[in-house]
């Protein structure tokens, strides 16, 4: 259990350093400061530690990818094909394993903070002045923290292009896709960077139809041509439809599906089913 916070005044607590965000950068800074003998507090908007990396980024996506890879190996193994019929796994089943991995990571990170005597505040932080942070916890209770040093490591969030209705229940960004709780037949992934390619391989591995829309001429153009070409080849071989030089202008939304209206560099707007 986290140690009891030392109240210096009836109105605030004081620390040598306060870190905003408990992802890899925030955690690294907090640990280094604590090991240097500083009195440290960390603030995170979530009710669990780990930051975006643990909850919506690297950890869950790699857990998903590992699970799907295991499913693919199982389905292709001749020995298992003989002893039982082919089984189709749903995204919901695969996500349950990712959530289990997330909880394991949260427990590990919590032990790190306990071991290094770092106080943890959960809530939204507001910088009041150069030495004061106000934190409102999930219950709305206000806590005032006074500090000498402040580290801001609040992470990032997915870019949401204008004109796309991300409030629609069938439109997800790379953070919200982990909340998918219904069966899908086809998914269109807009953006063919590292995250887009990774999720394309995950969904095609679960036997969903996948369109990968790339606004550029080739995948991951910063890579050597041989690597980018190999990636394109393997995605296509698995069944991913890669659509280069294409951008989505807007979405036509329906109750149970969305239809992107897209255009290429060389053509007028066209309906894509």
Outline where the language-model segments fall:
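Hydrophobic anchor at the start of a short beta-strand
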Residues: 39-40, 210
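Rossmann-like NAD(P)H-binding beta-loop-alpha module
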Residues: 181-218, 222-223
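Glycine-rich flavin
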Residues: 2-15, 24-25, 32-38, 44-183, ...
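Conserved phosphate-binding and hydrolysis motifs of nucleotide-dependent enzymes
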Residues: 21-26, 155, 191-196
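A broad helix-preferring feature
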Residues: 15-16, 196
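Single conserved hydrophobic/aromatic residue that forms the stacking wall/gate
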Residues: 272
């Amino acid at each position: 259990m986290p140690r009891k916070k030392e109240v210096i005044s009836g109105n605030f607590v004081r620390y040598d350093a306060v870190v905003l965000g408990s992802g890899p950068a925030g955690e690294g800074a907090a640990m280094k400061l604590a090991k240097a003998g500083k009195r440290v507090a960390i603030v995170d908007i979530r009710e669990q530690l780990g930051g975006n990396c643990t909850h919506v980024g690297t950890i869950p996506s790699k857990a998903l990818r590992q699970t799907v890879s295991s499913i693919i190996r199982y389905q292709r193994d001749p020995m298992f094909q003989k002893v039982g019929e082919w089984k189709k796994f749903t995204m919901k089943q695969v996500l349950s394993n990712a959530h289990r991995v997330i909880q394991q990571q949260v427990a590990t990170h919590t032990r790190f903070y306990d071991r290094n005597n770092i106080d943890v505040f959960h809530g939204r932080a507001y910088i009041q002045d150069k030495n004061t942070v106000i934190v409102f916890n999930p219950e709305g209770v206000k806590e005032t923290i006074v500090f000498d040093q402040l580290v801001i490591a609040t992470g990032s969030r997915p870019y949401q292009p204008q004109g796309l209705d991300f409030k629609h229940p069938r439109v997800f960004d790379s953070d919200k896709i982990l909340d998918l709780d219904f069966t899908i037949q086809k998914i269109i992934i807009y953006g063919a960077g590292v995250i887009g390619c990774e999720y394309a391989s995950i969904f095609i591995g679960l036997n969903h139809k996948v369109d990968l829309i790339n606004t550029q001429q080739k995948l991951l153009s910063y890579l050597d041509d041989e690597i980018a070409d190999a990636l394109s080849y393997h995605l296509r071989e698995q069944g991913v439809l890669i659509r280069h030089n294409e951008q989505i202008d807007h979405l036509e939304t329906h109750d149970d599906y969305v239809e992107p209206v897209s255009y290429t560099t060389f053509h007028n707007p066209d309906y894509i089913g």
